[in-house]
Amino acid sequence: LYSHASGTFVYGDRAKRLLIEQGISEEKLFAIHNSLDYDTQKALRESIHPSDIYKDHFQNNLPTIIFIGRLTKVKKLDMLVDALVCLRNKDEKYNLVFVGDGSESESLKSKVKGLGLDSQVWFYGVCYDEKTNAELIYNADLCVSPGNVGLTAMHSLVFGCPVITHNCFEWQMPEYEAIQAGVTGDF
């Protein structure tokens, strides 16, 4: 199928490499990379300033971890809640913010409550206002996506928030390619 097309768009360099390995001509493959509304986000990034959004909500100055995206099983967000418990057991505390909603929302809320993490976890909910998303991401210390990162990486990186996700790239979404290990995040 690919060999009959005059050209094919793919989301990333890995997909392009895999198709070349399958014998598809490099000249017919174009990596276009995924993104969000870059012009709007660039304007917001240039005008945004630090705020006390997390200090005001949590009533503390702890570092804040954010996840922005759909709260679904493939994101493995239960692992993020488990990590908070491990950190708490080592006397290291962090705030955690979930921006989004999805099929795992109620399960995550129940787990957080059962583990006594209510004061450290904020289920912000779905937010389609890009100015608010910019403030939430910009003021977070780190974005973590234990499962597939997807557009979460693009959203976080555009506002200067480093991203951590898994390093099993054959199971990852193409947006992981935007993360530069040790520079803009890690795997």
Task: Cite the ranges covered by each PLM segment.
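Acidic donor-binding loop of glycosyltransferase active sites
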Residues: 135-148, 160-162, 168-169
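Short hydrophobic "strand-cap" motifs at the C-terminus of beta-strands
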Residues: 11, 32, 67-69, 74, ...
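Donor nucleotide-sugar binding/catalytic pocket of nucleotide-sugar-dependent glycosyltransferases
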Residues: 2-55, 60
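Conserved donor-binding/catalytic core segment of Leloir-type glycosyltransferases
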Residues: 54-75, 80-86, 97
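Short alpha-helical segment that forms part of, or immediately flanks, the ligand-binding pocket
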Residues: 134, 152-159, 176-177
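Nucleotide-activated donor-binding/catalytic signature segment of Leloir-type glycosyltransferases, i.e.
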Residues: 99, 106-127, 139
